[in-house]
Amino acid sequence: MSNAKTVKVTLVKSLIGRLESHKACARGLGLKKIRQTVEVLDTPENRGMINKISYLLKFEG
């Protein structure tokens, strides 16, 4: 994983009251708590989830 492209994603807004599909995207990225940061592979699938809930996230990479 050290040579694969990754993206750092941080959940900055609450999932309370959000659409179930948006909550599922956050869970799919491995995010459970506010201010939790995870590093995910830069794949089209992960990029799609990041784009869908970009208003809840801060990401770099």
From Swiss-Prot:
It comes from the Bacteria. GO terms for cellular component: cytosolic large ribosomal subunit. The keyword Ribosomal protein applies. GO terms for molecular function: structural constituent of ribosome. Keywords: Ribonucleoprotein, Ribosomal protein. CDD domains: Ribosomal_L30 (cd01658). InterPro entries: Ribo_uL30_ferredoxin-like_sf, Ribosomal_uL30_bac-type, Ribosomal_uL30_ferredoxin-like. One of its GO terms (biological process) is translation. Belongs to the universal ribosomal protein uL30 family. Part of the 50S ribosomal subunit. This is Large ribosomal subunit protein uL30. It comes from Chromobacterium violaceum (strain ATCC 12472 / DSM 30191 / JCM 1249 / CCUG 213 / NBRC 12614 / NCIMB 9131 / NCTC 9757 / MK).
